[in-house]
């Protein structure tokens, strides 16, 4: 069995913790949370660059601080936002069985991956700026005789992959309060039962 994991809000506590950390660092630099949140809603659907985000906010606020210093203060804390419980499970599964496929701005996502130190637990890591479909399909095709379990917190990415094209794919919506082992066991047994009925 092979496993594909998303990064943000699966392996990396992005929304509840890291984003809060970003806002606190910006406030410390003199950028109000309201201004930062408002601007974030304008740019979040595009390929996000934290460096550009900080630079624009500094420029708009006429704040004389170095973007690089604020960026470094934010990014240096990346290891503190890892879902260590899930990372332990990934380590148990083995590097050769695990892939990481994440959506976002390439430079920013890659920097989060590098600074958090998680890449060493995966046979391959992919940063995509559009659909995950192509990469997921490629992984499924490479392991067509095995089940490929795909964890993502966002239904749009889970639903993006055609089960007709990837019959060995088991998509699972990840929620932080669920027991990982139990989730895999239940979903895998359910899919095996469905396959027997066909």
Label every model-predicted segment.
Residues 114, 119-150, 154-198:
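Asp-based, Mg2+/Mn2+-dependent phosphohydrolase catalytic module
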Residues 28-31, 41-74:
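A metal-dependent, Asp-based hydrolase signature
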Residues 1-38:
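Active-site neighborhood of HAD-like aspartate-dependent phosphohydrolases
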Residues 10, 17, 106-107, 156:
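Conserved Rossmann-like nucleotide-cofactor binding loop
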Residues 1-2, 96-97, 145-148:
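Short coil/turn segments at beta-strand junctions that form active-site/ligand-binding loops
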Residues 11, 98, 150-151:
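Conserved SAM-binding loop
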Residues 91-99, 103-127:
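Substrate-recognition/cap helix-loop segment adjacent to the acidic, metal-dependent catalytic center
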């Amino acid at each position: 069995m092979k496993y594909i994991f998303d990064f943000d809000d699966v392996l990396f506590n992005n929304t509840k913790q890291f984003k809060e950390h970003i806002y606190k660092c910006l406030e410390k630099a003199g950028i109000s949370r309201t201004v930062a949140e408002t601007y974030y809603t304008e740019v979040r659907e595009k390929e996000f660059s934290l460096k550009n985000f900080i630079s624009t906010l500094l420029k708009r606020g006429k704040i004389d601080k170095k973007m690089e210093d604020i960026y470094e203060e934010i990014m240096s804390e990346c290891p503190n936002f890892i879902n260590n419980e899930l990372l332990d499970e990934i380590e148990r599964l083995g590097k050769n069985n695990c892939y990481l496929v994440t959506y976002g701005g390439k430079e920013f996502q890659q920097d989060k991956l590098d600074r958090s130190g998680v890449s060493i637990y995966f046979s391959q890591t992919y940063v995509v700026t559009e659909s995950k479909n192509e990469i997921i399909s490629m992984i499924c095709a490479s392991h067509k005789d095995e089940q490929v379990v795909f964890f993502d917190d966002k239904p749009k990415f889970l639903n993006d992959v055609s089960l007709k094209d990837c019959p060995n794919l088991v998509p699972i919506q990840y929620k932080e309060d669920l027991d990982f082992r139990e989730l895999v066991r239940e979903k895998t047994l359910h899919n095996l039962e469905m396959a027997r009925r066909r």
